[in-house]
Amino acid sequence: DLHPRVRRQREMCIRDRQEVYYKHAADGQKEYYKWLNEMYNEGILDPEFATQTHEDFVLKVAEGRVLGLLDEEWDYTGAEISLRADGQEEHTYAGLPVTIDRSVKCPSLKQQNLAVGWGIGITKSCKDPVRAVRFLDWLCSDEAQILLNWGIEGVDYYYDENGKRCITEEDLEASRKDTNYSERTGVGFRVYPYPSYGNQSVDSTGNSYSKSSREMVKEGYDEMEKEALKAWNVDMLTDIFPQKEEFSKDAYSPLWALTLPDELEKMLVALDNVSWKGLIECVVSPADDFDAKWDELQQNLKDAGLEKADREMTALLRDEISRRE
């Protein structure tokens, strides 16, 4: 199944770390969409992929009707919780590092640079701006980070005899099967978009700030996931992916985090609109018509300002890199 969020096509490809290309005119995209076209014509791809709402998509996943999907894990986690609550662990998902080209490594675990496109502001009407800043400062403290991620000591977590911060089996089970767990308890509910440490960061006691640490993830695996670990002979499900050490760290923020000039933003919106219509036509066309549909899409993208958008995005990237040097 394809998540309807593919309507938001604003993704760019970076070649040789200096050149930016609009994704749907970049190398490799034609092969990918030709594969989708083949799956559509074979009846494997959901025929409603282009018309369903996000709610439709999530409901299908939650009902165990979707064999495989292309999506970010955070977007379907709630549906997986529903599957576990219904005893349908066999219908949950394990990520696979699949790429169209075997020579290309799946970069899911690649370490990203700091995203600095968003900021924090204090309004003129704030009655106590000093207190507001102190609150933001407190959010970065161990006390606040533990509260946001773990909850209240003695209620949501405890320390064992070795000083390890733990949650009960009941809470672990609830966090995996209750879709309202975070909202009901407050645990993890306000971590994003506030300041937070990475999953492997530890506090002054040596315990992880996050409940998504390697150790906590392993403790939370269900029986189906444990069977996969055994079959793949790995310690964690992510061990089958290329590890972050296999990639160089980019010297720039993720492009989605950059603030774009209004004119460039409008150009990208126009390209997105052309892409959404044209990609649907490519995917649902008879196989013999795919090449012609793809060529038509590429010409329409050029007419919509593709080359200018690529140049301006490349200039933004190079400016970002130069500021960090």
Regions found by a protein language model. Give the residues of each.
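Alpha-to-beta junction loops
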Residues: 62-74
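Short, solvent-exposed loop/beta-turn-alpha elements that line the ligand-binding surface or hinge
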Residues: 15-27, 101-110, 159-183, 314-325
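Conserved small-residue motifs centered on glycine
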Residues: 146-284
